Amino acid sequence: MTSIGQRLVTVRPLPPGAAWVAVRVWFSILVPLLVLVAIDHVEWTLYAVFGAFTSLYGRERVDLHRIVRQGAAGLSLITATILGALVATSSAREWLAIPVAGAVAVVASYVSESHGWIPPGSLFQVFAFAAVASVPAEASDLVPAIVVVTLSALFAVLVGNVGAVVRRARRTADPAPPGHPIGGAHSGGWLYAAQSGIGVIAAGLIATGSGIGRPYWAMVSAVVPLMTHDFAAQLVRGLHRVIGTFIGLGVAWLLLDLDLADAVVVVIAATLQAFTELVIGRNYAFALICITPLALLIVHLAAPVIPINELLGDRGLETVIGVTIGLLVGYATRPRNATRA
């Protein structure tokens, strides 16, 4: 059995087609965000980003199969974002967000597990809901949220399928779906969905109850280890999350300290997501070095009133809280006959 230490430092080969995926993701994120900068509505960037995350799905499929997969994933992201915007209008949003985030985690995890989504799990749906719900909003913000996230998701589907006509003309066969990227395909969808829901709710209660500024990062981090089902793999993924996040916080501090123009921030954010797609299949910690500054740049762009040091500190602390809770849930609910790591 490969040791935990070896798994932590293993760098796998670049997956086939990763460069094209990165380009599609980069363009899908860049264009909607630049449009918002141009019309002077950077406060809507969260809605656009989460719609654009539709481009992360369906990479292993072509033609109609990709459209269907991205359409389903996009609908889940649109729904999560709109739910977040609704909760954001409530004066009790901090506590209301916890059970709703748990429900989002359960439903998205089950659908992902049942249909073999890549990337797996409910990470992006929980992220979309909880991040949007954390920013105070008015009822008048609901229409922009619905319009922006929907158009952004549709644009991502368009970008992801522009080559379909060429492939069909060349009679390119649909590739066989690859193995599950982090642990293999599994049955028992409701068990894994319940794990995610429990982890999200527990992390939300602890982070919110302790008065930390942005509890949604703890909820998102709790999902991360539970995206795979073997506890040794969960431990490696959790450690990757913490290690990569803390290195990424240094990168984020350097970028945020520069006080860059909004358009420059958008280009950097899209490029960071593209780099993420190039390295996430090789080593998850590498991906977090890109994801962490990306997330912080977008949050700061949408809500620039948050002090940078507070933003960085909350991210680090909540990541540790969330990963710890996710690992505890994974360990407590592991199969009784599971081999020790």
Residues of each region from the PLM?
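Alpha-helical transmembrane segments and their membrane-interface boundaries
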Residues: 1-293, 298-341
